[in-house]
Amino acid sequence: ISPADFAINHPAGSLGKQLTMTVADLMLPVSSLPALQPSTSMPDVISMLTQGAIGSGWVEDPGSRGRLVGLITDGDLRRALKENNSDRWAHLQASDLMTADPITVTSELMAVEAMKRMEHNRRKPISVLPVVNAHGQLEGLLRLHDLVQAGLT
C-alpha cells in the first residue's frame, strides 16, 4: 500500500494528516484577524493585538485593500519596547514595529511543509505565517500552535 493510499484510509493518523492536511484546513481566516495600517500608533497596536488574542496582527497596504505589507507579532512588540526608551513609545507606528515583507505561504500548501518552513527559518524561528493569494492579499494566518494542536509534530 502506498503512503497516499494509507492516508486516504487513515486520515486521522499522523501520516494521514501529513499527506492530506493543507494550510487552508488550519489557518485563521482574515476576517478574524486585526488589520493594522502602517501609521497605526503603538498604543493602538497594543490594544488591537490584545483584543485579538491571536498574538499577531497584519499590516495592510493603505493603497491596496487587503494586500499584506507586514506582520507584527508579540515578539516584535517586545523587541520594540526593549530597543526604544519609554518616551519614544507613543511615537512609534506599526511600520516601525512590523516585519516588512514576511515569509508567506499559500492556502494550497501542505500543512507539514508550512511547519518545516517555520522550523527551519534561517533568521529566526517563525511562530506565525501569513497566508496570501497570488496577488499578495492576505487570506489568513497559520500559527505554529495550530499545527501542533492538529498533531503535525
Regions found by a protein language model. Give the residues of each.
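Terminal peptide-recognition signature
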Residues: 26, 49, 66, 97, ...
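A beta-strand-loop signature enriched in Asp, Gly, Thr, and Trp
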Residues: 45, 49, 56-93
